[in-house]
């Protein structure tokens, strides 16, 4: 093999909106409410190996807006990307998939959610930036805690070992 074939390689093959749904169970009456809605946001990241060097990473977002006890809208979206990742050491692969890939995808998710909310007739809601490194580290700590509670060795996704 040549040196070029052994070089670390990272490429975005595709970014796409995998799924999106919007519900407005209390429309049109909710538009007459004068109170400001409370907004809850949930974000999750999942990754799947599609082939030896190909990964699908999905950033899911759920935004729920309520006025008093009535749901104004509920939007769920999944922004996905297919990434070609080669010649990356195992200890660097999981952080790349769990931090860098979601960081690339999140602006697309945020834009799609904001657009859908506006098109649904509501004032725009712009999701704040997310520190995917902190989210990743939190997940590793949870995995470590679960493994410790089960009496298993420390482990992280993709088989990397935590120190």
From Swiss-Prot:
Source species: Burkholderia ambifaria (strain MC40-6)
Protein name, entry field: Protein-export protein SecB
Gene giving rise to this polypeptide: secB
Example GO biological process: protein tetramerization
UniProt GO MF annotations: unfolded protein binding
Protein family: Belongs to the SecB family.
GO CC list: cytoplasm
Domain of life assignment: Bacteria
InterPro entries, per database record: SecB, SecB-like_sf
């Amino acid at each position: 093999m040549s040196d070029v074939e052994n070089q670390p390689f990272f490429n975005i093959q595709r970014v796409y909106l995998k799924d999106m749904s919007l519900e407005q169970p209390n429309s049109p009456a909710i538009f007459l409410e004068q109170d400001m809605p409370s907004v809850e946001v949930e974000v999750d990241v999942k990754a799947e190996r599609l082939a030896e060097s190909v990964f699908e990473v999905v950033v899911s977002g759920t935004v729920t807006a309520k006025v008093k006890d009535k749901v104004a809208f509920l939007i769920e979206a999944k922004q996905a990307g297919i990434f070609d990742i080669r010649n990356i050491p195992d200890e660097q692969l999981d952080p790349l998939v769990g931090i860098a890939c979601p960081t690339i995808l999140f602006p697309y998710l945020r834009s799609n959610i904001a657009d859908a909310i506006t098109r649904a007739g509501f004032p725009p809601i712009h999701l704040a930036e997310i520190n995917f490194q902190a989210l990743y580290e939190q997940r590793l700590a949870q995995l470590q805690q679960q493994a410790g509670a089960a009496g298993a060795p420390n482990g992280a996704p993709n088989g990397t070992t935590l120190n």
